Every structure is written in structure tokens, then in C-alpha cells.
């Protein structure tokens, strides 16, 4: 059975489809945790819900094709904070029903990586399939090379997805860079954040309205970062609800933030 260096072993389409559908059903059935941040509650469940990144996710574009053609592969997602790197990694795992493990190169260490190897190995023995390993801030993971990539990557144990805010040509180790496809993510445009605002109001704050001036302030503060935008909206919306305010205006946003 053939695999690429970090990709999945070949398996019947029926198995892939069944696993993917099971993963989607599990996510849909899970209750929404109202204590979690707004950005987490609004995290997209399909690539069609992803805001922005049309150059990668539009019809016929490279990353969308990877989803549609059932071809998870090792990749590096390069872009500023809050543009969907973690979301896309999770969606890749969900789309194919693969387990997902996130490792931070800043907070994690070799022990965390070895634990991930053990979990991925157990999954491989149980299902015959690989695990998506997401390396946060992968420009710092110099020790990943010896601990993970050499002994375990060759076996197809992992489909590795790395996220970086730095230029991978200069910051990512060559062993990783040469075996991964680099996708460049862009800061969200104003219209993307407006779409996100409409979604948040519809799903989470149906009794609230945000006037045009307040909207401009929120978008300006976000600077293309969806997480920052939603955090600011959540603070404003929570204060408005507590005070019985139905329309958030520019004065209220300035006072809240």
C-alpha cells in the first residue's frame, strides 16, 4: 500500500466517506457551549462557511480541490493571525474523518510530540488510517525533524498541517518545507468581516443591531483578523445585552472597547 511522506495510505472510498460522515454527524450532534468564546462558537463546520480566502477555496482553486478530491496532504498555511489557519486544519481532518491532534511549538515539547506519536500509532493500528497533526507556530519546530518527521513521517502515520505567520522560505526547516505544499492566506477584507458580522448577529445575537458607524469601528479595530473582530463584537454585544440596549452605535463601541 503506497503513501506519500506524510499522507494517508490508500483506502476504499467507502471507508473514507463513512468516516467523514461520522465525524460530521458527531460535530453536529455536539451541544454548543455558550461559555466558549464567540469565535469558537462560530467556527466554520464546512469549507463553504469559511469567510475569505477565495483565492484558495473558490471553485477549482487548489485548496478546495484537496477537500473535494479526497486528498489530504501535508501543507503549511502561511498568513497573519485570525485568518483561518486552525479552522482549515480542523476542517481537513473532519472532511475525511481523521483524528486531529494540535501541538504548539511554543507551549509544547518533545513529550507532547511523543504523546502525539503514540496516539497516532494507536489510531493507525485500530483503523489503518493516518492522523492529522497540526503544528501551531511551525517556524519554531526545529526539533520536530528528528522526533517526528524522520522516524514517523515516512510511514504515513501523519498528515502534517503547519501554521506560521512567518515567511516559510526563511523560517521553516527545509525538511518540512520540501515535503509540504505552502498555501498563503490573506487578511480578511472589509466585506468578509461584514459577512461575519451578519452571521454572528443572526446566530448569536438576533435581538441586537449594529449601526453602520459602529460596524466601521469594529472592522477598523480588527485589521483583517476575524478572531479580533469577533472578540470585540462579543464584548460590545455582552455589555449591550446586560444594559438592555438593542442597537449598538459608535459611541457604545468606543465606550465598551
Q: Could you tell me what each predicted segment is?
A:
Residues 103, 134-135, 159-165, 184:
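Structural recognition of the conserved hydrophobic beta-strand(s) that form the central parallel beta-sheet
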Residues 56-61, 99-131:
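Short glycine-rich substrate-engagement loop in P-loop NTPases that contacts/grips substrate
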Amino acid at each position: 500500500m503506497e503513501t506519500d511522506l506524510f499522507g494517508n495510505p490508500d483506502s476504499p472510498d467507502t471507508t473514507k466517506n463513512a468516516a467523514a460522515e461520522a465525524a460530521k454527524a458527531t460535530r453536529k450532534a455536539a451541544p454548543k457551549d455558550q461559555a466558549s468564546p464567540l469565535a469558537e462558537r462560530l467556527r466554520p463546520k464546512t469549507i463553504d462557511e469559511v469567510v475569505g480566502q477565495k483565492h484558495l477555496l473558490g471553485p477549482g482553486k487548489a485548496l478546495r480541490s484537496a477537500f473535494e478530491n479526497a486528498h489530504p496532504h501535508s501543507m503549511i498555511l502561511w498568513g497573519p493571525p485570525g485568518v483561518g489557519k486552525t479552522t482549515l486544519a480542523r476542517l481537513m481532518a473532519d472532511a475525511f474523518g481523521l483524528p486531529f491532534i494540535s501541538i504548539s511549538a511554543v507551549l509544547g515539547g518533545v513529550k507532547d510530540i511523543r504523546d502525539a506519536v503514540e496516539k497516532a500509532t494507536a489510531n493507525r493500528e485500530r483503523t489503518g488510517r493516518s492522523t492529522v497533526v497540526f503544528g501551531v507556530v511551525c517556524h519554531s519546530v526545529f526539533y520536530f525533524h528528528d522526533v517526528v518527521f524522520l522516524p514517523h513521517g515516512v510511514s504515513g502515520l501523519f498528515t502534517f498541517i503547519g501554521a506560521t505567520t512567518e515567511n516559510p522560505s526563511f523560517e521553516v526547516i527545509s525538511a518540512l518545507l520540501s515535503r509540504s505544499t505552502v498555501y498563503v492566506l490573506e487578511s480578511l477584507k472589509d466585506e468578509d468581516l461584514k459577512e461575519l458580522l451578519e452571521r454572528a448577529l443572526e446566530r448569536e445575537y438576533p435581538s441586537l443591531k449594529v449601526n453602520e458607524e459602529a460596524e466601521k469601528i469594529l472592522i477598523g479595530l480588527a485589521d483583517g483578523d476575524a478572531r479580533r473582530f469577533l472578540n470585540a463584537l462579543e464584548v460590545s454585544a455582552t455589555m449591550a445585552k446586560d444594559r438592555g440596549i438593542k442597537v449598538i452605535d459608535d459611541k457604545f463601541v468606543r465606550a465598551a472597547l
